Amino acid sequence: MNRRNAFKFLSILGLAPLAARVQASTPVVAPEIVDRKYWLRVLVKIADPLLESLSRGELRKNMPVECKPGMDADRRKVTYLEAFGRLMAGMAPWLELGADNSEEGQLRKKYIALAQKSMKMAVDLQSPDFMNFTEGGQPLVDAAFLAHAILRAPNVLWKQLDETTKQQIVVAMKSSRVITPGYSNWLLFSAMVEAFLLFAGEQHDELRMDLAIRKHMEWYKGDGMYGDGPDFHWDYYNSYVIQPMLVDILGELMKYSKKYEKTFETVVKRAQRYADIQERLISPEGTFPAIGRSLPYRFGAFQLLAQMALQHRLSDELNPAQVRSALSAVIQRMIEAPDVFDSNGWLRIGFSGHQPNIAESYISTGSLYLCSVGLLPLGLPASDPFWADALMDWTSRKIWSGQDFKADHAIND
């Protein structure tokens, strides 16, 4: 299906045009079904050029590589796995709902097929789009995001694959072990690869998982936040990487051993607190502080909040409907900024629009697809309270509109 027909199909489903922006001075008025359709429209717009190209073995041919001057040759070695692994990490829960006879179910059927074909292209040595899992440090990062995607969609991204592709994935993941992780959140990338191998019934290294868990427990700084290594960094890596991976690595280990049970309970409690903080960071206008590195990941900054909603682990302080409303405001504001996409639908570097100077040297086009993890709640069915409950103001809208509100408190653990 070409891009013109794809968007015609989306129009038939009622997924176009984009919903009206959330206005800070008025209540959120869009019906709940519009929110889901809007999120779906965003996901498809992000995913379409990437999966259409990769599924045909044309990703290298078609995907532009925007990066800092002088970094082109370096980033071309890694940007394609970045793009695919990160997109799948966010898209996986929606794909895992499977195909059905509904309009959305038929759309999922299309993208499940594209994702499965793309997976084959990514790990087949004979493919023109075979991806680099070994050269440089970056491939470990994105092998981990791809591994995380498989854990989030074990049926469509693993069980439904042919045995040859499964074995090629295992070989690719094991090959990433040649990369030594840094003494930082990178320990979790090695651990996530091993968690996938555990899931797949393959030889795995529990020590790599145990080390990552132990060090992050040591690096906890309090009130729901971990250091990135021994030091605290005021950025969004607690959400981009640390807490989503820590929760899910422990969740996978818990299927095989209860020895991590107490640690898991502690990590989830901390994640609930950090999700509370994330929701409070969203302003009445749908903005949030532009602090720290990797800002071009855009609303991927809210992966942890999105994951806690997906897993029904939000604290009692948060109603799922207010989380949906808050995230919708952020997504709309960021995705509708000018020049977010190029003329062929590929993401461009920026936080609010196209801002190439905001990128670090390690950022390239593929990096940007981490924004998709902000859309994780699409993995909840439309009947889930996250989608079905009436829209609700989020914390900052309530407080700044003058509503009385109880005090916020740190957790002491």
Question: Which residue stretches match the model-derived regions?
Answer:
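N-terminal export signals
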Residues: N5-S25
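Low-complexity, Ser/Thr/Pro/Gly-enriched N-terminal "stalk/linker" regions
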Residues: I12, T26-E82, A89, P93, ...
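CBM-like carbohydrate-recognition segments
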Residues: E52-D72, V123, P128, V330-D413
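Aromatic-lined, polymer-binding surfaces characteristic
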Residues: Y80, M91-A92, R108-V268, R280-Q303
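An N-terminal, globular interaction/scaffold subdomain
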Residues: A83-A89, P93-W94, A99-R108
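Long, repeat-rich segments with strong aromatic
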Residues: F232-L347, A359-A382
